[in-house]
Amino acid sequence: MSARPILWDVDTQVDFIRPGGKLVVPGAEEAVPAMTQLVRFAHATGIVHVASADDHELTDPEISDTPDFVHTYPPHCLRGTPGAQKIDETAQA
């Protein structure tokens, strides 16, 4: 068996990327065109697109109304909310 490349897509979700998201990563929106190109290339060439998604409920220990941003964070990527969805540009086939 030979090694094959994969596209490893980590948590490209609305709450981390889009303006107004609950825990936006600085500069993430500017990286979306590059993400789009990577996903399109992977789909076109048969590269496997592996994706993770952050997933929380309000009762998770990481979620806090008074976050320390080390061990706790404000509510984000709450299961079933628009912010938990992958952005369209990184949607899997």
What are these regions (language model features)?
Residues M1-A93:
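Active-site acidic carboxylates
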